[in-house]
Design a protein with these regions (language model features):
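N-terminal periplasmic/intermembrane-space "pro-region" immediately following the signal or transit peptide
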Residues: 3-6, 10-15, 19-46
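Outer membrane beta-barrel
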Residues: 32-51, 62-207, 233-236
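Transmembrane beta-strands of outer-membrane beta-barrel pores
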Residues: 51-55, 93-97, 130-132, 201-205, ...
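Outer-membrane beta-barrel architecture
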Residues: 74-76, 114-116, 186-188, 230-232, ...
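Repeated loop/turn-to-beta-strand initiation elements of outer-membrane beta-barrel proteins
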Residues: 83-87, 121-125, 194-197, 237-244, ...
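Detector for outer-membrane/organellar transmembrane beta-barrel domains
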Residues: 229-348
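Outer-membrane beta-barrel "beta-signal"
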Residues: 382-395
Length: 395
């Protein structure tokens, strides 16, 4: 870490330390989504705004100070029936994002749009939504999800040759994300004795709002008839709470080319929380493996795998959160594709100003290597680090 990064991080730490005093007028905030009822139907609109300032350093380049932002809207319409069932529709609209944030679903404005039925016998979802193997994932505690290394929705490093986020070369993720927000049908059981089951069926890897409408483009090695299955468990034992997760996604290669195969993607994870009295300590992690190169379901090979390991810990004391995160991943070489390795570390401190606002400061270091070819910097390796100050507003 160089001097300029140290200065930036020191400034961020001072701002974070001033948070409680400066936020005294905000401490009583408890904003709820805007809502209205009409003819037995209830409609609401919530959302999340992310704003991040950072100082990043990369190989073969000068340090760079910048900012990134994103805005999501969460509309919902539902009706409670006389039998206690609730029916409705939900969505997530990516109202704004730049090239470094909010892009986990591939630039979709309408990231999610689905119908649901919630009953005492379980919940059914029908439409453009996460699959069961991702939605039920437990992969370790985080101070702030969006800026974590694992499943990052905000990054600080740009490939100057493309203008896109450099981390897209191998985006590590420890939950099974193979069916993304493709149109699907899902069912989740009620939780019984701490156990919940989930299953999803995705006919085709397309985003047409509802499944079975379109088969999508007929491209080579496309996966059809994908099935997600997941199980998780939550239990409490005195001062200890335990969460465990297993998920998988399997598909059929409908246009197989030599060397490619059906998709098989699976993960195991968990988290252990212990109540210390004045604070809570959480530990967790996950293992994720897929035959999709760099976890890409459209590039599933017959031999070789990609795997990701994630470990994290978090200490929560009142409104303060302290976290450490470690992630590593390897994508085996395939045909003309190089072997890729990535390792990352992150330390962060968060302060919950109120139920709507959280301020987080931190530092992360990432390293990427390849066994053939070079990255944009002309080297087979890329080292990068960043200090950041992140504000999340959620209603």
């Amino acid at each position: 870490m160089n001097l300029r990064t140290g200065i930036w991080l020191g400034t961020a730490a001072l701002l974070l330390a001033a948070g409680p005093a400066g936020a005294s007028g905000l401490a009583d905030w408890d904003l709820k989504p805007a809502s209205v009822e009409l003819g037995g139907w209830a409609a609401s609109l919530g959302g999340t705004a992310n704003l991040t300032g950072y100082r990043a350093n990369e190989d073969a380049g000068a340090g760079r100070t910048g900012g990134t932002a994103s805005l999501f809207l969460d509309p919902e319409v539902s009706r409670l029936l006389a039998n206690g069932w609730r029916v409705g529709a939900m969505g997530v609209i990516n109202a704004y994002h730049d090239q470094l944030s909010g892009d986990n679903y591939g630039n979709d404005v309408f990231q999610k749009s689905y119908l649901f039925v919630a009953t005492p016998y379980g919940r059914v979802e029908f439409g453009q939504q996460d699959g069961a193997a991702y939605k039920m994932a437990m992969t370790g505690p985080l101070v702030a999800d969006a800026i974590a290394i694992d499943d990052a929705n905000i990054t600080f490093y740009r490939d100057p040759t493309t203008g896109e986020a450099f981390t897209n070369v191998f985006a590590v993720r420890s939950g099974v994300f193979a069916t993304k927000n493709d149109a699907k049908l899902s069912y989740y059981t009620p939780r019984l004795l701490g156990v919940q089951l989930g299953v999803s069926y995705t006919p085709h890897m397309v985003k047409d709002g509802l499944p079975f409408i379109s088969a999508g483009p007929h491209i080579a090695d496309r996966q059809d008839n994908l099935v997600d299955a997941a199980i998780n468990y939550t239990g409490f034992f005195g001062r200890t709470s335990l969460g465990l997760y297993a998920g998988l996604s399997a598909g059929h290669n409908a246009a197989r080319t030599p060397g490619h195969d059906d998709l098989f993607d699976w993960a195991l994870g968990g988290e252990l929380d212990y109540d210390l009295g004045e604070a809570t300590l959480a530990l967790g992690g996950a293992w994720h493996q897929s035959n999709g190169y760099t976890l890409d379901p459209s590039d599933a090979f017959a031999h070789g795998t990609t795997h990701v390991v994630h470990a994290s810990t978090k200490l929560t004391a009142g409104s303060w959160l302290f976290g450490l995160e470690y992630s590593t991943g390897t994508a085996d070489a395939e045909a003309a594709l190089p072997k890729l390795d990535t390792t990352g570390y992150e330390a962060s401190v968060g302060y919950r100003i109120n139920s709507n606002l959280q301020l987080t400061a931190g530092w992360q270091h990432l390293r990427f290597t390849r066994d053939s070819g070079v990255f944009y910097n002309g080297l087979p390796r890329a080292n990068m680090e960043a200090g950041f100050l992140y504000l999340r507003f959620h209603v």
